[in-house]
Structure formats: C-alpha cells, structure tokens
C-alpha cells in the first residue's frame, strides 16, 4: 500500500517533504513522488494540488500527520 507521509530533510533545522512512499519501506526509502514541502519553523507549506488529487484518486492513503499538516496549512499552490 502506498501512503503520503513526511520525510525528514536537514539535520539541525528540520524541514519535511511529504512524499508518496510504499508503507512497508523505511522512512528514508525510495520515493515514488514528492508532492509537498513543509517547514514547521516558519509554518510554510508548498503543495502540488494536482499531484495530490491524482494520487488520492489512485488509492493512496494519508497518514494522520499529513492530514494534520493539510488542516493547518496556509496553501501555496506550486
């Protein structure tokens, strides 16, 4: 099963990329598609709405963390 989940980037100042990844693979595993960038320090979110809708239409599940990020986001469409 494929899920949208956060992938950590950076060591000291954490940022996250929301990626479509196989649920059985490890956190830093092979990414199928990258759909979002999230910076919790600046509350900055950049989304690719078209990619998210096509992935969700094809059966990709959202993790609870990603759902919370979507709810809090001030959307910048890329």
UniProtKB/Swiss-Prot annotation:
GO terms for molecular function: structural constituent of ribosome. Transmembrane segments: none annotated. SUPFAM superfamilies: Ribosomal protein S16 (SSF54565). Keywords: Chloroplast, Plastid, Ribonucleoprotein, Ribosomal protein. Pfam families: Ribosomal_S16. The keyword tRNA processing does not apply. It comes from the Eukaryota. Its main location: plastid. It is found in: Plastid, Chloroplast. Belongs to the bacterial ribosomal protein bS16 family. HAMAP family: Ribosomal_bS16. NCBIfam families: S16. This is Small ribosomal subunit protein bS16c. It comes from Adiantum capillus-veneris (Maidenhair fern). The gene is rps16.
